[in-house]
UniProtKB/Swiss-Prot annotation:
ATP binds at residues 67-74. This is Protein RecA. One of its GO terms (molecular function) is ATP binding. Can catalyze the hydrolysis of ATP in the presence of single-stranded DNA, the ATP-dependent uptake of single-stranded DNA by duplex DNA, and the ATP-dependent hybridization of homologous single-stranded DNAs. It interacts with LexA causing its activation and leading to its autocatalytic cleavage. Pfam families: RecA, RecA_C. Keywords: ATP-binding, Cytoplasm, DNA damage, DNA recombination, DNA repair, DNA-binding, Nucleotide-binding, SOS response. NCBIfam families: tigrfam_recA. GO terms for cellular component: cytosol. The keyword Electron transport does not apply. Residues 331-354 are annotated as: Disordered. It comes from the Bacteria. PANTHER family: MITOCHONDRIAL DNA REPAIR PROTEIN RECA HOMOLOG-RELATED, RECA.
Length: 354
């Protein structure tokens, strides 16, 4: 629909005044001088990258990963950091729980010598550090472990047993308003790890909720629910966990998709095992009886041997990964965000701090 000449002149004058006052680029047409594709970082799990619809976690956004204890939350974020570092990106880990194990992080592929780490005393300090790193424009990925450990200063300085209703929720709400714009401007990915709490007196529906109030639920572009659904065994020994991740909220693609993968103790996500499964599913890898073949060449008898072969031949593994991504991501279009709060419940505004 055409705009008449007087309106065009008035609009041009208004845009010129806005840019003069607030700087160039402060207002523009949505499709002007910018890529519509979202830049992403791999999660370290091929099936989860595909479930997210964009090939990974989106840069310049807030992401929340929550689940029960020992479900793989920290492992998943360390895999994201390792993937980002392999691309030459700078990463920071805000260890509010004071529980980061550098030896374990190194086993997962994290370059701990170049990983920025902070163990803040208060929640406010942790969030100010996040904001300072984002505003610097020099940090690409920030992980906060965890929201539940972001204790307000007033609570730390008070007595155990004092009531501090809503303090953490208010602190998170203020931080989200401040951080969202800075993260977008600097194209920094901020990942919050969160814990689960139970609502008291819930008779129907899911009683689970996350800590820190509701602000994070609104501001997060992606919310991932991670659960341990079984054990990985070698004979009688448990060597890992079968893990399921549900994309509860997704603003960059269709939500509610799921991914299942293995987390092996001391190794992290079993990426090459996923590659074998997805390769067979997409008919890139042939399976005849117990034998697996690629391009007519046998790569192993049994999944374990095929996985080991791919690990020893990274060039072939990369080739298969590229083909899988092209097949499974090319037809996924972005859709509006129809996702709601945890497990299908609508979000109710509250000042309660769980």
């Amino acid at each position: 629909m055409a705009i008449d000449e007087n309106k065009q002149k008035a609009l041009a004058a208004a845009l010129g005044q806005i840019e003069k006052q607030f700087g160039k680029g402060s207002i523009m047409r949505l499709g002007e001088d910018r890529s519509m594709d979202v830049e992403t970082i791999s999660t370290g799990s091929l099936s989860l990258d595909i479930a997210l619809g964009a090939g990974g976690l989106p840069m310049g956004r807030i992401v929340e990963i929550y689940g029960p204890e020992s479900s793989g939350k920290t492992t998943l974020t360390l895999q994201v950091i390792a993937a980002a570092q392999r691309e030459g990106k700078t990463c920071a880990f805000i260890d509010a729980e004071h529980a980061l194990d550098p030896i374990y992080a190194r086993k997962l592929g994290v370059d701990i010598d170049n990983l920025l780490c902070s163990q803040p005393d208060t929640g406010e300090q942790a969030l100010e550090i996040c904001d300072a790193l984002a505003r610097s424009g020099a940090v690409d990925v920030i992980v906060v472990d965890s929201v539940a450990a972001l204790t307000p200063k007033a609570e730390i300085e008070g007595e155990i047993g004092d009531s501090h209703m809503g303090l953490a929720a208010r602190m998170m709400s203020q931080a989200m308003r401040k951080l969202a714009g800075n993260l977008k401007q600097s194209n920094t990915l901020l990942i919050f790890i969160n814990q689960i709490r139970m609502k008291i007196g819930v008779m129907f529906g899911n009683p689970e909720t996350t800590t820190g109030g509701n602000a994070l639920k609104f501001y997060a572009s992606v919310r991932l629910d991670i659960r341990r659904i079984g054990a990985v065994k070698e004979g009688e020994n448990v060597v890992g966990s079968e893990t399921r991740v549900k994309v509860v909220k997704n603003k960059i693609a269709a939500p509610f998709k799921q991914a299942e993968f293995q987390i092996l103790y001391g190794e992290g996500i079993n990426f090459y095992g996923e590659l074998v499964d997805l390769g067979v599913k997409e008919k890139l890898i042939e399976k005849a009886g117990a034998w697996y073949s690629y391009n007519g060449e046998k790569i192993g008898q049994g999944k374990a041997n095929a996985t080991a072969w791919l690990k020893e031949n990274p060039a072939t593994a990369k080739e298969i990964e590229k083909k899988v991504r092209e097949l499974l991501l090319s037809n996924q279009d972005s859709t509006p965000d129809f996702s709601v709060d945890d497990n299908g419940e609508g979000v109710k505004e509250t000042n309660e701090d769980f």
